[in-house]
Regions:
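A gly/proline- and charged-residue-enriched helix-loop-helix capping module
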Residues: 1-8
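N-terminal secretory/targeting leader peptides
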Residues: 8-237
Length: 237
């Protein structure tokens, strides 16, 4: 309902939108330096990101440059930036991230989740018979499920390729940096909530997360424990 309110009432768009293809957390990104473990290590670091993440990482002391994707590699080559994030192992490798940096830090709260949206012209959709509307809705759900599974397969395969074929070292972002990101969000969120609609969105998200993630954390067994059991020594975190 909040999404409908945003697109139709606030933005005045003649559309019906549906979310789909929930994507995992974006990596913290690519760094020339292999030793990025503390908040002090990123102070003043020239770093490419965009959107709300730019505000977040500026709050943490990084020198943020909001560059389009096509300018990332040239900017790294010229020393305009020292590090960058883009999206995921597949998208990153497609544009040659591995050619300008060899240290890839996974795990970050700068964009912990995202999803695609399917937009239909509202007049067109509502003019269709109920069965045809249902076909489109189920097609979105099917595409969402398929893309989620395909992405997990491709991202993991491309990450492995980056390590074995391109000499990339994969790191897990340190708890110190992750905790600092959360503190920075706690500073930024009250400013975002000054907008009444955004405040209702945040309240809805918090209510959902409090309930669903509680269940997930209580019910899901420790994946790292199982991974270490069956693949001892594979993780280097």
């Amino acid at each position: 309902e909040l999404y409908r309110e945003l697109t139709q009432d606030i933005m005045g768009l003649n559309v019906v939108g549906m979310f789909g293809f929930p994507m995992p957390s974006q990596p913290f990104g690519w760094f020339k330096d292999a030793d990025v473990t503390s908040v002090q290590d990123i102070q003043g670091l020239k770093y490419r990101t965009v959107g709300l993440a730019a505000d977040l990482l500026q709050e943490m002391g990084m020198a943020v440059a909001q560059l389009p994707g096509g300018e990332i590699v040239p900017a790294m080559e010229r020393g305009v930036i020292d590090a960058f994030e883009f999206n995921n192992p597949s998208s990153d490798s497609d544009f040659g991230a591995q050619d300008v940096a060899k240290n890839y830090y996974l795990g970050s709260y700068h964009q912990a989740s995202e999803s695609f949206e399917w937009l239909f012209n509202r007049d067109m959709l509502e003019s269709l018979d109920d069965d045809l509307q249902a076909i489109l809705i189920h097609a979105v759900e099917a595409a969402s499920t398929s893309n989620t599974a395909s992405a997990l397969d491709r991202y993991s395969a491309d990450l492995q390729s980056l390590q074995t074929e391109s000499g990339v070292t994969v790191h897990r972002t340190s708890d110190e940096i992750l905790a600092a990101q959360l503190e920075a969000w706690s500073t930024l969120i009250p400013t975002l909530e000054e907008d009444s609609f955004m405040r209702r969105v945040m309240e809805s998200q918090k209510e959902w997360v409090e309930r669903t993630v509680f269940y997930e954390l209580m019910n899901q067994p420790d994946l790292q424990l199982a991974y270490d059991h069956f693949f001892p020594g594979r993780l280097n975190m």
